[in-house]
Design a protein with these regions (language model features):
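ATP-dependent carboxylate/acyl-activation modules
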Residues: 1-126
């Protein structure tokens, strides 16, 4: 068991990956937490991707304004978030037994990105 960490308020982001039958490993990111289904603001890439491509995916989001420090809030560390997106893409691309990864929410703060909950579903080809 790992000790819980105190985290500052930030922006909740979803980072996920799946094995699509047509495209293979895919990674996605978007506004997370309870807002994922409400706003449907996600960006997808075929995995694996590097941090620069992950950052481009993040910058496509309508929610980028929240991550950049909307209404006086501190901007999120988008580079740290891009590292998380790239890592999830690598995980799905490298492990065929993984059919789905859902990291939601990832809390993006000015000091980094912290996964608060995650689910890995096995079921692909081993």
């Amino acid at each position: 068991m790992e000790e819980a960490r105190d985290v500052d308020a930030g922006t909740e982001v979803i980072v996920g990956g799946l094995r699509d039958p047509s495209f293979g490993p895919v990674v996605l990111t978007g506004l997370g937490g309870i807002f994922t289904e409400v706003y449907e603001d996600t960006s997808h890439r075929i995995a694996p991707i590097d941090a620069a491509e992950a950052r481009e995916a993040i910058e496509e989001l309508t929610a980028i304004e929240l991550l950049e420090g909307y209404r006086g809030r501190d901007p999120a560390d988008v580079d740290a978030l891009a590292d998380v997106v790239a890592a999830v893409g690598d995980l799905v691309a490298e492990h065929e037994a993984i059919s789905e990864v859902d990291v939601n929410p990832v809390l993006a703060t000015s000091e980094g990105a912290v996964a608060l909950d995650a689910l890995v579903v096995l079921g692909g080809d081993a």
